[in-house]
Structures are given as C-alpha cells and as structure tokens.
Amino acid sequence: MKKVLILICGFYLFLYILGFIIPQKITHPVLERLSKPVTIAHQGGNKIYPDESLLAFTNAINMGIQVIEFDIHRTTDGIIVINHDHTIDRLTNGTGLIREMSWVELQQVDGAYNWSPDGLTYPYRDKGIKILSLIEMMDAFPQQLYDIEIKQHDPPLEKDLCDLLRKYGVAADQAIVASFRDETLARFHDICPEVATALPVNQGTILYILSRVGLERLLPLDAVVAQLPTTFSTKLGQLELDRRYINAFAKGNRQVWVWTVNDSIEMKRLMNMGVHGIITDRPDILMDLIHHSKEYAN
C-alpha cells in the first residue's frame, strides 16, 4: 500500500513539474496581426529620412512595413512626444531636456536641422519638420502597429501612456511597449495589462541561462516579444543570440525581434536562424530582400 501511495504521489509530482516545463502558448490580439517575417522600421527608418519624423513614418508605411518603432517622452505640460534622445540637442536647432520643456517650446525648433544622410548635407533644414506628439502619430496612422519604447522614467509616464492608448482604442491589438528599464515595464504592465509588452532585460538573461538546460518554462513571462541585439551585455558578460534562445522564447507562441540590422546578408542570416522580426533603419533594404526572396514573399 505504501509503495502504491509513493507511486501515485510520484506520478502527480511528475505531472506538476511537467506542467512547468511544457510551454503553454500565449494568445494576444497583437500577435494575430503579425506575419513572419515581421518588418519593423526603427525610428521610421532614420537612415532614409529624419529620425521619427512624419516623413520617415509615412515612407515606411508606404513600403509595406508592418510595425513602426519610436521612443516617447513627456513635456512639462503633459504631452507625450516622440523623440529618441532625452534632449533635443542632436537633431534640432534647439537645446534642452524634453521633460523640462513645454509642447509650445518644442514646436518652435526645427526637428531635422542637424539630420544628415552623409554628414555633409542637411537636406531637411527649414522644411517645416517638427517633433511629433503621440496623438499626432495616432491621428495620422490610426490602424498602424506601434512599437513604443518608453525612454523617460523620471517622472514616470506609464499611466499617461496607458490612458492615451485606451482613449484612442489602440491598446489591445496595435501597441507593443518596450523599455530598457525593467521597473518601467513592470509598472506599465500593472497599469495596462491588456497591452503587449517586450521582454525585460533581467528576464532575458535568466531565460538565456534556463534555455541552456531546457528549463525555460520555469520562468513565467508576461512578454509577447523579445527585442534584442545579436550580442547583448549582461551581468554574465556578452551573450550571443542563437537558435536555442530563439526556440526557447518562441515555444510559447512568442516572437524574437532583432535590432538594429541594416545589412541584407545579416537580415537573411537571422531570418534563417528563426528570428521572427527585423528592426532596421533601412526598411527599403529589408522590404527588397523579402520581395525578392521566394521563401518570404507572399
């Protein structure tokens, strides 16, 4: 009798452990809109047109890019704006931290004053290019998929972002939110659980370790997408993105996107490795590769 009980207990323990190890597929509305390979225009394609400008986003969308990636901050008067850097110094003819400026002040600068395709010419100076607000983005491209990176963390803007996405009805199936700060992503997910989020940095490191021994299912994940470079720095040192890591994350119906890839040979290598999406400054190169590839062309 004792042996039978031990066997029964052992059997249920086995099932319990198995339940953690066997991946359970996630479902999310945003995943249903993505087709492999997922094409993502980094800052709209900032090697073609000025970073995160209406010109860049329009060009990428007209090419057929699935997702446009951009970064957000908030002004002193509460407007969420699109800009890569914390300051406006690099690209505009102004200076200052965005979080210390008003929307009116931002609209007074030339958004592409210092942008150059070759380091010698400045073709978009005095062309009326302005820093965009998130509202302007959603008004211009109401059906587009957005990959939104929260850059500002102090003061936090997660609630304002969630409120705005909900107001415009894009929360459930149009937005993926990312951040290099794990605490920022955690706060946003708590406030806005219906919106897809990217893999936090620390979880990415743990997942890498577990994937080496086939125990990736032991790590509970809320993320639907991992956005990674091919080589990433961790407390363990430099780690290389490989097929094992991609497969470990993808088992739960999740996706791996790689940034920032501007070379067609590298794009093809990564797609052949199993990467789901390519984040690029050159959407023209990526779309040309897909259109001329029998494997990826529709």
Segments (PLM) and residue ranges:
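Metal-dependent phosphodiesterase/phospholipase catalytic core, i.e.
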Residues: 6-11, 15-26, 84-196, 219-252
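N-terminal signal-anchor transmembrane helix
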Residues: 22-38, 54
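Hydrophobic faces of well-ordered beta-strands that scaffold small-molecule active sites
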Residues: 39-41, 68-70, 146-148, 175-178, ...
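Glycine-rich beta-to-alpha transition loops that act as phosphate-gripper elements at the mouths
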Residues: 43-44, 51, 179, 203, ...
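Catalytic domains of carbohydrate-active enzymes, especially glycoside hydrolases
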Residues: 56-74, 140, 219-226
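Catalytic cores of alpha/beta
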Residues: 186, 263-275
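C-terminal helical cap(s) of enzyme catalytic domains, especially alpha/beta-barrels
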Residues: 283-298
